[in-house]
Amino acid sequence: MHQRALLFSALLTAVRAQQAGTLTEEVHPSLTWQKCTSEGSCTEQSGSVVIDSNWRWTHSVNDSTNCYTGNTWDATLCPDDETCAANCALDGADYESTYGVTTDGDSLTLKFVTGSNVGSRLYLMDTSDEGYQTFNLLDAEFTFDVDVSNLPCGLNGALYFTAMDADGGVSKYPANKAGAKYGTGYCDSQCPRDLKFIDGQANVDGWEPSSNNDNTGIGNHGSCCPEMDIWEANKISTALTPHPCDSSEQTMCEGNDCGGTYSDDRYGGTCDPDGCDFNPYRMGNDSFYGPGKTIDTGSKMTVVTQFITDGSGSLSEIKRYYVQNGNVIANADSNISGVTGNSITTDFCTAQKKAFGDEDIFAEHNGLAGISDAMSSMVLILSLWDDYYASMEWLDSDYPENATATDPGVARGTCDSESGVPATVEGAHPDSSVTFSNIKFGPINSTFSASA
């Protein structure tokens, strides 16, 4: 979808390299946030955001010939992973007109459909604008405002962290010449195989175009790392979910050994694709979150997440608060028999898996301890997407599809099972959007007033 009339030539400096293009200037939209040291003492940070490399125009280093069109690689430019990486460049982005991404001070708005583009995924850059901003979440608090009033069933306006490399993988994989400036290095607990480039090489080998998405496919390789989903939500449902992995750093996997959404064996990889989720509706509290409910999704809200550590400094509890209309509101309590509390702990996760009859893959990958080591350096991700694999039913409807809705853990929200089908939501709600703003980070109880 990105054709350009300009031409240029480039000298290849490596046999294998993930190149940076120059046909479109890359200018990161600015976004401010606040670093707090004590309650009421916060300092503004001048950051910016960058769009993920998977959304970018990928073309020949010698001219504007597409390396990737629709969901297919050019066979001449990309006969294999290494040749493709040497032949192809990631180019700059026009954030607003192409991707529907706008910023204003401390506010970031992501529009759902802009022209032929659907959704977006962005990373917070550091103040130098050279690498990703990293956060040590242990014994810390992360707070933001969000407006989900324009996010219907089937959409997910997500704010989360993963253990990406701060430089986008450049130091580990010198063949990666694009780096964080061009949004490289993504990884998560699904070990996604739809990435066009991983570890400085293309993902051409074994690439299979998607049968239901004209823009995507999956390759032989995936990119794995621990993931902390602070916020996956629309105006009907929300979930808070840690996902541990066996390694605290980004790793590349191959084929079905990746596990996750993109593989035949969901639990065959080194990460937990399910995580231990706290969705108030799924936990039996159907009056807590939604339009006109305790947390009214018709209005902007403040979301506070605290990462509590034990005496050894390891993550032991994840707590959630909301602030709306001047009121501090604790997370909903579980109403599921045998599962107590309103925070994520080891005991909560064990009891929840048992009550819902779910495989405890979370514990198999060492639970909270399995994500704790990664939390000393995580990258902030903000995205808006629809779900070509499960129509977002796992977030806002009944899931799995063949389960009985009245069984514990099956109902996750009030959305109809067909409402999240991508063709439906893209056709009916292209003007949907989410706005994140007022991001704050600091020690426990430093980013909001408990007596608000």
From Swiss-Prot:
It catalyses: Hydrolysis of (1->4)-beta-D-glucosidic linkages in cellulose and cellotetraose, releasing cellobiose from the non-reducing ends of the chains. The active site is at 227 (nucleophile), 232 (proton donor). GO terms for molecular function: cellulose 1,4-beta-cellobiosidase activity. Induction: Expression is under the control of the xylanolytic transcriptional activator xlnR. Keywords: Carbohydrate metabolism, Cellulose degradation, Glycoprotein, Glycosidase, Hydrolase, Polysaccharide degradation, Secreted, Signal. GO terms for biological process: cellulose catabolic process. Pfam families: Glyco_hydro_7 (PF00840). GO terms for cellular component: extracellular region. It is found in: Secreted. It is an enzyme of class 3 (hydrolase). Glycans are attached at residues 62, 285, 335, 402, 445. The gene is cbhA. Residues 1-17 form the signal peptide. This is 1,4-beta-D-glucan cellobiohydrolase A. Its main location: secreted. The biological conversion of cellulose to glucose generally requires three types of hydrolytic enzymes: (1) Endoglucanases which cut internal beta-1,4-glucosidic bonds; (2) Exocellobiohydrolases that cut the disaccharide cellobiose from the non-reducing end of the cellulose polymer chain; (3) Beta-1,4-glucosidases which hydrolyze the cellobiose and other short cello-oligosaccharides to glucose. Its EC number is 3.2.1.91. InterPro entries: ConA-like_dom_sf (IPR013320), Glyco_hydro_7 (IPR001722), Glyco_hydro_7_sf (IPR037019).
